A protein has these predicted regions:
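Bacterial Sec-dependent N-terminal signal peptides
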Residues: 1-22
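Acidic, mature catalytic/reactive cores of soluble proteins
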Residues: 19-190
Length: 190
């Protein structure tokens, strides 16, 4: 891979030096994230309008009123940060909520809103399950999660399989679901 990057960089007239760019604000940003996880936690157990109730507290993409729902692949990256910063219980709750969605709907929606029903995102749930199992060592939890992961896999093989035999994420939204999404999106934009 390094050879490929060197050749591509040379072809583009760039010098490959094998280092990561340093942002002078990075430590402050990192500290802000670490100190503010608690501001991204929501807990809504009952379905309310378009919001899907989830059994465990969960994290949303940002603090404030803009988001009350969790998002599938955002949660993978969030969980990595939560574990790194000493919040494995929140990462497990996030993962348990996604497993709950599979048990309830047969798949994980793009986000925990009804208008995301027809949209899928990259399936990171098995990696989240692996991460939580490695933290907890809970074999019964893993066995239960494995059964649920098989159900999610079935969705990908039925609904998101291409003629090449590969899977892809996408949308099969009806006009009604698109309209529902536009109403909420419009409210967010003011």
């Amino acid at each position: 891979m390094k050879k490929i990057l060197i050749v591509m960089s040379a072809a583009a007239g760039l010098a490959f030096v094998g280092c990561r760019p340093q942002n002078p604000d990075a430590p402050a940003v990192r500290e802000f994230i670490r100190d503010n996880w608690h501001t991204t936690v929501q807990h809504c157990t009952a379905d309310t309008a378009t919001l899907i109730g989830l059994p465990y507290p969960y994290t949303v993409p940002t603090a404030g009123a803009m988001f009350r729902e969790m998002y599938y692949w955002d949660t993978f990256f969030t969980n990595e940060g939560l574990v790194r910063d000493g919040h494995p219980e929140l990462a497990k709750g996030n993962t348990d909520n996604l497993l709950y969605m599979v048990r309830r709907f047969g798949k994980v929606y793009n986000g925990s809103r009804t208008y995301y029903e027809a949209r899928s995102q990259t399936p990171y749930l098995s990696m989240m399950v692996d991460r939580i199992y490695r933290l907890t060592g809970d074999k019964q939890w893993l066995a239960d999660a494995y059964q649920t992961l098989k159900e999610e896999y079935g969705f990908w093989m039925r609904e998101r399989l291409t003629p090449t035999g590969l899977n892809r994420y996408g949308s099969s939204a009806s006009d009604a679901l698109v309209d529902e999404f536009l109403v909420t999106g419009g409210k967010r934009l003011g």
